[in-house]
Curated annotation (Swiss-Prot):
Binding site for FAD: G7, A8, G9, L10, A11, G12
Keywords, ordered alphabetically: Cytoplasm, FAD, Flavoprotein, Methyltransferase, NAD, NADP, Transferase, tRNA processing
Tree of life domain: Bacteria
Family, as annotated: Belongs to the MnmG family. TrmFO subfamily.
Gene: trmFO
One MF annotation (Gene Ontology) recorded for this entry: tRNA (uracil(54)-C5)-methyltransferase activity, 5,10-methylenetetrahydrofolate-dependent
The name this protein goes by in its record: Methylenetetrahydrofolate--tRNA-(uracil-5-)-methyltransferase TrmFO
Cellular component GO terms held in the UniProt record: cytosol
EC annotation from Swiss-Prot or TrEMBL: 2.1.1.74
Length: 435
């Protein structure tokens, strides 16, 4: 059977490579350079359109642990990155052109991979195996078909998310639980006095923002106004908008605070909370500085920064099973950022995971879920099984992993032990369930 892969980004390239090198026949569709996207510059596979950094290789960093697991499973992304590496301290940074050229040439040399430089605008869902790995820049030609396949309400244009912090880093001596007018206790509320609010407002309006390309601007601002833009419209704008205290009584004072920052739970276990109404395009360093002006968040650990950009992704918890297959069409897989993983390595890792299970299915075996003690397994489980409400894209972070059985106070030592457990778990899994 032929496996059809749409899109030769990081995820699609991993699928084609990991199947192709094992003799599985693959048709890899890539419309570039015949039809370019708004963000790509070349026709190479796995082109890095933003940063040239693939982040840390240190296993006590979540991105480093993710790479260690990917190397165990086999990754064209990391093999090519070694050949394109440029000096960057503990981080893995690459020469973009050398990197993308290497990925392209390796896949072109695989005899079982047929490369088709055409745009796919539709396909027969009942015929063969399909892997949709079209990324955040999915073509306008394919979108109508995907909407028809998935349903209009299940294909999102992702243009804004708020920062997400860990629950354990919120100062609950300062914050209080509650919903407006006493209608529940679903939200964490961070009260601000007049002086604290004005200090926060001043820091927000003076903070540096990320400049967006022209192609993004119309899409973003007609859909969702960043919190810093609301703040610039007037000193009290936030108090009558996302920070309004109406109906929220601080149990310590018996009164409504001057302003309130609300946090909403992001996962079933209650480990992550997002800041309500804090969609932003502030630089990441500025987000950290400004959020720490909020007393209850002075020590907040941000596991996902707020971002605003044009993106397309699907509501994976409703549409996909844990193997990234469409529930109503199990022969159609999705991989990469379109599934709701965020980041270069996360996207590539999802491609490896999909390739692994497609390979098992073609061998007549059942697909397998990766252990949740691994970073890959925890990330994919979060995306598919643990999100409450609508999915917001997530990247690798240690907060996703199940806690250690023994409490470790030192943060570095805790991450080291979590990483060691993850690597040993992945090694054992692959020994018992090889490709």
């Amino acid at each position: 059977m032929i496996v059809n892969v749409i899109g030769a980004g990081l995820a699609g390239s991993e699928v084609a490579y990991n199947l192709g090198k094992r003799g599985i026949r693959v048709r890899l569709f890539e419309m570039r350079p015949k039809k370019m996207t708004e963000v790509h510059k070349t026709g190479y596979f796995a082109e890095l359109v933003c940063s040239n950094s693939l982040k840390s290789e240190d296993i006590t960093n979540a991105e480093g642990l993710l790479k260690a697991e990917m190397r165990l499973m086999g990754s064209i992304t990391l093999e090519a990155a070694e050949k394109a590496r440029v000096p960057s301290g503990k981080a893995l940074a690459v020469d973009r052109n050398i990197f993308a050229k290497e990925v392209t040439e390796v896949i072109e040399r695989l005899e079982s991979v047929e490369i088709i430089r055409e745009e796919v605008t539709e396909f027969d869902p009942e015929e063969g195996i399909w892997v949709v790995a079209t990324g955040p820049a999915t073509s306008d030609g394919l979108l109508p078909f995907l909407k028809k396949l998935l349903g209009d309400d299940l294909l999102f244009f992702f243009d804004a998310v708020s920062p997400i912090v860990t629950f354990e880093s919120i100062d609950m001596e300062c914050a209080f639980w509650g919903d407006r007018f006493g209608k529940g206790k679903d939200y964490i509320n961070c009260p601000l006095t007049k002086e604290e609010y004005e200090e926060f407002w001043k820091a927000l309006v003076e903070a540096e923002v990320i400049e967006m390309e022209d192609f993004d601007r119309k899409l973003l601002f007609e859909r969702c106004q960043p919190i810093e833009e609301i703040a610039r419209s007037g000193k009290d704008a936030l108090r009558y908008g996302p920070l309004r205290p109406t109906g929220l009584v601080d149990p310590r004072t018996g009164k409504e605070p001057y302003a309130v920052v609300q946090l909403r739970r992001e996962d079933k276990e209650g480990r992550f909370y997002s800041l309500v109404g804090f969609q932003t395009r502030l630089k990441w360093s500025e987000q950290k500085r400004v959020l720490r002006k909020i007393p209850c968040l002075r020590n907040a650990e941000i596991v996902r920064y707020g971002v605003m950009h044009r993106n397309v992704y699907i509501n994976s918890p409703k549409l996909l099973d844990i193997f990234f297959r469409l529930k109503k069409h199990p022969n159609i897989f999705f991989a990469g950022q379109i599934t709701g993983v965020e980041g270069y390595m996360e996207s590539a890792a999802s491609g490896i995971y999909v390739a692994y299970n497609v390979h098992r299915i073609l061998k007549g075996l059942s697909p397998l879920k990766l252990p949740e003690e691994t970073m890959m397994g925890a990330l994919f489980s979060y995306i598919i099984e643990k999100v409450e409400g609508d999915l917001k894209p997530m990247y690798a972070n240690f907060g996703l992993l199940p806690p250690l059985k023994v409490r470790v106070k030192d943060k570095f030592e805790k991450r080291k032990k979590l990483a060691e457990r993850a690597i040993e778990t992945m090694k054992k899994f692959l020994e018992e369930n090889p490709w």
